[in-house]
């Protein structure tokens, strides 16, 4: 991906993500499924002006959903666990 604004889709606001942020200083983002770790790191550093130490990614499979007799499926998506460098501030208070 060439556009850094197309890489990040938004933060993942779950209980697990909040615990990871408090304990390890990690932030979880929903990202474009075809983006790689280098693009994710570059996008976060440019958009939020923070230093990224490490990026881990996980591809999430779409779930099967049923409405009456009709069976469908949610889209597959990707999330990134981003570890911030020591001394970086908590920037998710602004989100």
Swiss-Prot record:
One of its GO terms (molecular function) is structural constituent of ribosome. Keywords: Ribonucleoprotein, Ribosomal protein, RNA-binding, rRNA-binding. Transmembrane segments: none annotated. SUPFAM superfamilies: Ribosomal proteins S24e, L23 and L15e. One of the early assembly proteins it binds 23S rRNA. One of the proteins that surrounds the polypeptide exit tunnel on the outside of the ribosome. Forms the main docking site for trigger factor binding to the ribosome. Belongs to the universal ribosomal protein uL23 family. Part of the 50S ribosomal subunit. Contacts protein L29, and trigger factor when it is bound to the ribosome. This is Large ribosomal subunit protein uL23. It comes from Desulfotalea psychrophila (strain LSv54 / DSM 12343).
């Amino acid at each position: 991906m060439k556009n850094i604004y197309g890489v990040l889709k938004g933060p993942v606001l779950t209980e697990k993500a909040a615990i990871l942020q408090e304990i390890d200083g990690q932030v979880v983002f929903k990202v474009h499924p075809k983006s790689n770790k280098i693009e994710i790191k570059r996008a976060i550093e440019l958009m939020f002006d923070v230093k990224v130490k490490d990026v881990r990614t996980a591809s999430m499979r779409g779930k099967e959903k049923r409405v009456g007799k009709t069976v469908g499926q949610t889209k597959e998506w990707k999330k990134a666990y981003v570890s911030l460098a020591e001394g970086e501030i908590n920037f998710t208070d602004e989100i």
